[in-house]
Amino acid sequence: MNMKKGVSQLTLQTLSLVAGFMAWSIISPLMPFISQDVDISPGQISVILAIPVILGSVLRVPFGYLTNIVGAKWVFFWSFIVLLLPIFLLGQAQSPGMLMLSGFFLGIGGAIFSVGVTSVPKYFSKDKVGLANGIYGVGNIGTAVSSFCAPVLAGAIGWQNTVRSYLIILSIFAILMFFLGDKNEPKVKIPLMAQVKDLSKNYKLYYLSLWYFITFGAFVAFGIFLPNFLVDHFSIDKVDAGIRSGIFIALATFLRPVGGVIGDKFNAVQALIIDFVIMIIGALILSLSSHIVLFTIGCLAISICAGIGNGLIFKLVPSYFSKEAGSANGIVSMMGGLGGFFPPLVITFVTSITGSSHLAFFFLAIFGVIALITMIHLNKKEKAIRI
């Protein structure tokens, strides 16, 4: 394996993921500004914030498969080119419908996650895959970049011009990928239906999908709803809410490689069991508290566990599915993305019915317990095989 090429492609793809996630998440931190100019109901806000997750999740399966066919270079390149259109439309949006339309196609920025997790392991030995995928996952920091920077820029130049500035960023990365992407990336051309048939018989795929539905889903969902939630429920300043949301995202992002390293050195399933116990405790804190201090503690616990859990899970995916890595990565990451779609809608619905969001966070704890049971089951089966 060419380590020099591996490092260069890992760097390029990680930075490309940053750009993609910046575009994918641009609406959420700007929503407090957008809602001042566009007449939007609370229900419409929830839908608009959740919509980018749909395409960002569903496209992860074909993107992972295409990466094995044509290589990461071309999937990244054309994704950035296509993303220019919804960014342009968002900068012109004057109605909820236009916000929804542009947000839907911004999902492409989230779908490119499966490109790197399929491509990067090809350049590294098995004992380095967890770390490499963890480093690539740091590209999730693009969400935090938007959370930190977009509100500040919007306050200075307006939210429309802030959105338009992303056209420059995406154009730069399209050019970089065109000239620096690896055109000789190893290809894997196993027929898609053959991969799906084999994967559908493996219960581990369903377990990993459930776990990632929770960990990455929490990462995405909290990043989506926190800015508006903090403003509405705790009367926090819009810029301060963006910074707090950015801290949540940054913490989870930078801990992702830590999860990968833990998975490389120790039993990843056992580490996930510990991780989920702490996450369940964090969810229970959120479900039982209304004070900003306790809410912050619960959010930090969720952030830490989501980040480490994401890294651990994507250590396991290439280990369990080496021949079907592209499709498996796509399916698992798709489920993670979908995990971020439902919580904002559930929180809005529960709050409208009960007057409080507590029950919604309790649902997260319940899902965590279900996942914990499956982890214990898998750990017992693997122990029996080792014996």
Swiss-Prot record:
Probably required for nitrate uptake under anoxic conditions. Also possibly involved in excretion of nitrite produced by the dissimilatory reduction of nitrate. It is found in: Cell membrane. Induction: Positively regulated by the two-component system NreB/NreC. GO terms for biological process: nitrate assimilation. It is a multi-pass membrane protein. GO terms for cellular component: plasma membrane. This is Probable nitrate transporter NarT. GO terms for molecular function: nitrate transmembrane transporter activity. Belongs to the major facilitator superfamily. Nitrate/nitrite porter (TC 2.A.1.8) family.
